[in-house]
From Swiss-Prot:
GO BP annotations listed: translation
One GO CC term on file: ribosome
Domain of life from the UniProt record: Eukaryota
Location in or out of the cell: Plastid, Chloroplast
Keywords from the named record: Chloroplast, Plastid, Ribonucleoprotein, Ribosomal protein
Homology family: Belongs to the universal ribosomal protein uS2 family.
One Gene Ontology term of the molecular function aspect: structural constituent of ribosome
Name the UniProt record assigns to this protein: Small ribosomal subunit protein uS2c
Length: 34
């Protein structure tokens, strides 16, 4: 199983991809600060 948590999104829309990557990177940065 390659996916732990599916994220429904329109992967053809650049704005959608930018939003998801932004949220993921923010979460990673916050997690690393602890």
């Amino acid at each position: 199983n390659l996916v732990d948590i599916p994220i429904p999104a329109n992967d053809d829309a650049i704005k959608s991809i930018k939003l998801i990557v932004s949220k993921l990177s923010t979460g990673i940065q916050q997690g690393q600060s602890y």
